[in-house]
UniProtKB/Swiss-Prot annotation:
The fido domain mediates the adenylyltransferase activity. It comes from Bartonella henselae (strain ATCC 49882 / DSM 28221 / CCUG 30454 / Houston 1). Keywords: ATP-binding, Nucleotide-binding, Nucleotidyltransferase, Secreted, Transferase, Virulence. The gene is bepA. InterPro entries: BepA_ID (IPR040548), Fido (IPR003812), Fido-like_dom_sf (IPR036597), NA-bd_OB-fold (IPR012340). This is Protein adenylyltransferase. GO terms for cellular component: extracellular region.
Length: 544
C-alpha cells in the first residue's frame, strides 16, 4: 500500500476540506480544472481509458489491500495526486496543504462509513479472509457469490478512498471472480440499481437486492439478457443509468408495460424499473403481436391494421381453469360462505381447517360440493372424527354440540357450492362481455366524414344537414366508440390523457392523439346537431 507523503510543515492543519479547491465542491486535480462538470467529464474519460488498460493486465497472485490500492492508483493517477492513498491517512498536496477524511457519510444516509482506524482494521480482515479462503477459488458460482457478497458489502462500508471507491471496488471483484473461474460483469449494473442495493444493505441490513444483483451479473444466461438490453438502449441513445435494470427473478410475478423484445429477452417497465425476461417464457403468439407501450396483458394490433382503423380490436384469451378458480376464491360472497364453513367446522370437527382441501376441490370442480354436503349430512364421521367424545352412555358437551351443528355444516357446504357456481357464472359472463367489448374494431371514418370534421365549425352543420348518409355514419361511429371504450378509457379520452389512453388501447401516443381528436370533434358535431334539432323542433312547436 502506498504511504502518505511526509508533511512539509509540522503546523499544517489537517482537514478534509483540503481535498477540494477553496470555495468549491471540486476535488483538487492534476488538470487544474475547478469547474465541477468539466472536471467530472475529464475524469470520467481518463478513468474509462485506464479501466481498459487495467482489464488487460495479468491477474495478481494475491487479492488484497495492496492490489485494491494499485487499481485505484492506476485509475486515478492522471487525476489525483492522492491516487492509491487511503482517506484516513493524512496526505500532503504539492500546494502544501494536508488532507484526511477519517469520517465520511453519504448525503441522505443514516449510517456513516467506517471511521479512522476502522478502515485499516477492516482492510486487514479482508486480506485475511481472502488469504484463508484462497481468493475464493474452487467454489461453485453460487458459493463464490455468497462469499463475495459478504466481502463486497464489507468493503462498501469501509469506503477506504476519498473518491473512486465504486469503480475501484467493482474492478477488484471482477478480477477476483475471473481468477476463481467465474464472472462478475458490473458494467451491466446501472448506477441507480447499485445505489438501491447498497442502501438496502447499509441502511436496512437487507441482502436480497445485492444477492439478486450478483446473480444477474454472474449467471451467463442473465448476462446475455442484460447485454442485449443495454446494447439496444445504447443504440437508441437512451440512458437508463438512473433506472434499476434487472433480470426477472424466478417465481416472481411482474405486472407492467411491455417495452419491446430483442432476440433473447423482452423488457417490462414496472413502476419505473426495467425487468428483463427471457422471451422463451412468453407464448409465441403473444410475442408476435406485442408492441412497446402495451400492457403485458394486452394484445396489440399489427401495424397495418392501425392504418385502417381508428380504434383497433383486441383479442382477450379465455380464462384458464386456474385463473377462474383464483378469481372465484377472491369473490366476496364465496369468502363469506367459506368463513361460515370454517366456523362450523371448528364446532363439528374441532378444527377450522378440516375441510380446506375439500373447499379447494369445490372451487375447482363445483360438482363435488353437493356430494360433500350429502356425505356430511348422512355420515359426518366419514369426513373426519367429530369433536368431543361419545363413551357409550355419555357424550361430552363438545360432541353434543357437534352433532347439533352437522346439518348446519352440510347446509353451509351446499351454500358455498352455490356461491362458487354463481361466482363462476358471473366471472365467465363478465369475461365474455369484456372479450366482446375488446374484439370490436372501430373503423376509420370515411374520407367524407373526415373532411366534414376538418371543416370550420360554421360549415360543419350545413354540410351535415344536406347529407343523411354522413349523419348516419357519424351516429354509427360514436355508438361504436362508446361500445368499444371502457369507462377509464372514456375518462382518459375526455381528459386528453393520451399516455393513459395509448397504454390502455395498446397503441402509440400519436395514435391516441388521433383517436382523441377525431372522437372529440365527432362528439362536438353531433352535440351541436342535436341541439340544433331540438331548437328547430321547439321553434316549429311554437309556430304551430
Amino acid at each position: 500500500m502506498p504511504k502518505a507523503k511526509a508533511k512539509t510543515k509540522n503546523t499544517e492543519i489537517i482537514s478534509p476540506h483540503h481535498y477540494v479547491y477553496p470555495n468549491t465542491t471540486t476535488l483538487k486535480n492534476k488538470y487544474g480544472i475547478k469547474n465541477l462538470n468539466a472536471f467530472l467529464e475529464k475524469c470520467s474519460h481518463d478513468t474509462a481509458k485506464a479501466m481498459i488498460n487495467l482489464r488487460e493486465e495479468s491477474l495478481p497472485e494475491y487479492f488484497d489491500t495492496a492490489y485494491l490500492c494499485h487499481i485505484h492508483q492506476q485509475l486515478f493517477k492522471n487525476t489525483f495526486e492522492w491516487a492509491g492513498y487511503l482517506r484516513h491517512i493524512p496526505f500532503t498536496f504539492a500546494d502544501g496543504t494536508t488532507a484526511a477524511m477519517p469520517e465520511m457519510k453519504r448525503t441522505g444516509w443514516k449510517n456513516a462509513f467506517a471511521i479512522g482506524d476502522e478502515i485499516q482494521e477492516g482492510l486487514q480482515r479482508l486480506d485475511q479472509t481472502l488469504a484463508e479462503k484462497n481468493n475464493l477459488q474452487g467454489l461453485t458460482r453460487e458459493e463464490f457469490n455468497s462469499e463475495a457478497i459478504e466481502l463486497f458489502n464489507s468493503l462498501n462500508q469501509l469506503h477506504p478512498f476519498r473518491e473512486g471507491n465504486g469503480r475501484t471496488q467493482r474492478l477488484f471483484f471482477e478480477n477476483l471472480a475471473k481468477a476463481a473461474g467465474h464472472q462478475l460483469n458490473f458494467s451491466l449494473i446501472t448506477k441507480e440499481r447499485m445505489m438501491v442495493a447498497s442502501v438496502a444493505v447499509a441502511e436496512n441490513g437487507d441482502l436480497e437486492p445485492m444477492q439478486h444483483l450478483f446473480e444477474d451479473i454472474s449467471n451467463p444466461e442473465k448476462i446475455r439478457l442484460l447485454k442485449e438490453f443495454m446494447h439496444t438502449m445504447k443504440n437508441t441513445g437512451r440512458n437508463v443509468n438512473d433506472r434499476p435494470v434487472m433480470v426477472a427473478k424466478e417465481g416472481e410475478t411482474y405486472t407492467g408495460t411491455y417495452r419491446g423484445a430483442g432476440l433473447e429477452g423482452f423488457a417490462l417497465n414496472v413502476k419505473g424499473a426495467y425487468i428483463i425476461g427471457n422471451i422463451d417464457h412468453l407464448p409465441p403468439e403473444q410475442l408476435k403481436i406485442l408492441k412497446p407501450g402495451d400492457k403485458i396483458t394486452f394484445t396489440a394490433p399489427k401495424a397495418e391494421e392501425l392504418k385502417k382503423t381508428l380504434i383497433p380490436k383486441e383479442t382477450l384469451v379465455p380464462l384458464t381453469k386456474l385463473e377462474i378458480a383464483e378469481m372465484v376464491a377472491e369473490d366476496a360472497f364465496v369468502h363469506t360462505c367459506r368463513d361460515q364453513i370454517c366456523s362450523l367446522s371448528k364446532i363439528v370437527y374441532g378444527s377450522q381447517g378440516v375441510l380446506n382441501k375439500n373447499i379447494i376441490e369445490i372451487i375447482k370442480n363445483p360438482s363435488k360440493g353437493q356430494q360433500l354436503a350429502t356425505q356430511i349430512e348422512r355420515t359426518p364421521y366419514s369426513v373426519h372424527s367429530l369433536a368431543g367424545f361419545d363413551l357409550i352412555c355419555f357424550k361430552t358437551g363438545a360432541r353434543v354440540r357437534a352433532e347439533k351443528h352437522v346439518a348446519l355444516l352440510s347446509c353451509a357446504v351446499a351454500n358455498f357450492t352455490h356461491a362458487v357456481k354463481h361466482a363462476r357464472q358471473e366471472i365467465t359472463k363478465e369475461h365474455q362481455a369484456e372479450q366482446n367489448r375488446l374484439r370490436q374494431e372501430v373503423p376509420m371514418p370515411s374520407q367524407s366524414l373526415q373532411d366534414l370534421l376538418s371543416l370550420p365549425k360554421e360549415f360543419q352543420q350545413k354540410a351535415l344537414g344536406v347529407s343523411p348518409l354522413l349523419q348516419k355514419e357519424l351516429t354509427s361511429l360514436l355508438q361504436k366508440v362508446n361500445s368499444r371504450l371502457s369507462s377509464s378509457e372514456q375518462r382518459a379520452l375526455r381528459e386528453n390523457n393520451h399516455e393513459t389512453l395509448a397504454k390502455n388501447l395498446g397503441v402509440s401516443e400519436q395514435k391516441a392523439k388521433e383517436i382523441t381528436k377525431t372522437v372529440m370533434k365527432a362528439r362536438e358535431v353531433q352535440q351541436k346537431s342535436q341541439t340544433r334539432t331540438v331548437s328547430h323542433s321547439k321553434t316549429l312547436a311554437m309556430a304551430s
